[in-house]
Curated annotation (Swiss-Prot):
Protein name: Nucleotide-binding protein YajQ
GO-annotated cellular components: cytosol
Protein species of origin: Salmonella typhi
Recorded superkingdom: Bacteria
NCBIfam families per UniProt: PRK05412.1
HAMAP family named among the record's database cross-references: YajQ
Record function comment: Nucleotide-binding protein.
A GO molecular-function annotation: nucleotide binding
Length: 163
């Protein structure tokens, strides 16, 4: 019986490469000359810290970071950025978390979406992923298109496709 898994993962190596590319661009940009502006990836916490001297510059750094991550294949929706920036002394910073795994509320929405579609497939929650099984490969591909088309605030990957 054909099946596949719906997961939401961020490749940390690609995230590190995107952060390095963003740092390289910031170092060469004229508007960041003589300004304390850094972007750091913390592998242990899976967070990216963006620090600068003003909140406007933090927004610019976030835009640069999102563009570089997108070029590396990491969607902007996989970055959880708080609305408020932290002001400490003369610097502003924000710690953005990389979304790893699918939260239980989003999992339930996906399962409900699949069941409401009336396709002949089964969806089961397994930890931080969802296993979808069905009799025909076409139904599974329809589920993939359905999940991709619905905006659930998080990018999804499809793994372990088996016939």
């Amino acid at each position: 019986m054909p099946s596949f898994d719906i997961v939401s993962e961020v490749d940390l190596q690609e995230a590190r490469n995107g952060v390095d590319n963003a740092v390289r661009e910031v170092e060469s940009r004229f508007d960041f000359r003589g300004v304390e502006a850094t972007i750091e990836l913390n592998d242990a916490n899976k967070t990216i810290k963006v620090l600068s001297e003003s909140d406007f510059q933090v927004n610019q750094l976030l835009d640069i970071l999102r563009a570089k991550l997108l070029k590396r294949g990491i969607e902007g929706a996989s970055l959880d950025v708080p609305d408020e920036f932290v002001h400490s002394g003369k610097t502003w910073y924000v710690e953005a978390k990389l979304k790893q795994g699918i939260e239980s509320a989003v999992q339930k929405k996906i399962v409900k979406l699949i069941k409401d579609s009336k396709l002949k497939v089964q969806a089961q929650i397994q930890g931080e992923e969802i296993r979808v099984t069905g009799k025909s490969r076409d139904d599974l591909q329809s589920v993939m298109a359905l999940v991709r088309g619905d905006d659930l605030g998080q990018p999804f990957q499809f793994k372990n496709f088996r016939d």
